[in-house]
């Protein structure tokens, strides 16, 4: 992806493209849902969980860090006796007509681009929270899902939990009367990530693809993997 393409320009273009919507996909020969998992920090756990479902086949595990991709492939192999393909570019998943859905657990700045491209490729999507890096991207994702008739689900586990659904339903039913205001607080005890220092990009990391549509910045030793959360180019802090 060209370093001269801004994330707004990239997403605006992909959201506006009108491709012929696929109204259905042929079932896989095994009658299983064939998926590819992108982003293998949180995605490693998701791949393990999905692989153990009797009606799911993990065909690809994808990460720009080749070591993580290989490790996750070994994990799935150990769980079900069949290794998925370990790849570095998620677009290979989208190009495969046998794949039904993309599971996107990549950093936040990739959620919208990957989801939109997957919808355009005729894939359904499960995307980790937050669904997008900013509200505008969320609108583009909704448009892509509707245009291409794809199912897109955001994995907000607490929102989908039975207990919280019951609580919200009771609020809507007026159990405590009209709600005028609410307050929420979130505290997490975290150590400092330091200021970081310029470093050579590890051979096993495709840092160019990791940055994707985000502004280009030099590689630092305190960002990849998890600490990208604390930089606005890629994350949303404690909010996301």
Where are the language model's segments positioned?
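N-terminal glycine-/serine-/threonine-rich beta1-alpha1-beta2 phosphate-ribose binding loop
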Residues: 2-127, 136-151
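Glycine- and other small-residue-rich loops at beta-strand/loop junctions that grip anionic moieties
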Residues: 39, 104, 130, 156, ...
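Rossmann-like dinucleotide-binding domain that binds NAD(P)(H)
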Residues: 208-212, 216-240
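Active-site/binding-pocket entry motifs
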Residues: 67, 188, 216-217
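Hydrophobic alpha-helical scaffolding
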Residues: 62, 157, 200, 236-240
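Active-site-proximal cap/loop segments of hydrolase catalytic domains
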Residues: 61, 76, 138, 164, ...
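Residues embedded in well-ordered beta-strands within globular domains across many folds
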Residues: 60-62, 103, 180-183, 211
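A contiguous active-site-proximal alpha/beta segment in oxidoreductase catalytic domains
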Residues: 124-126, 131-209
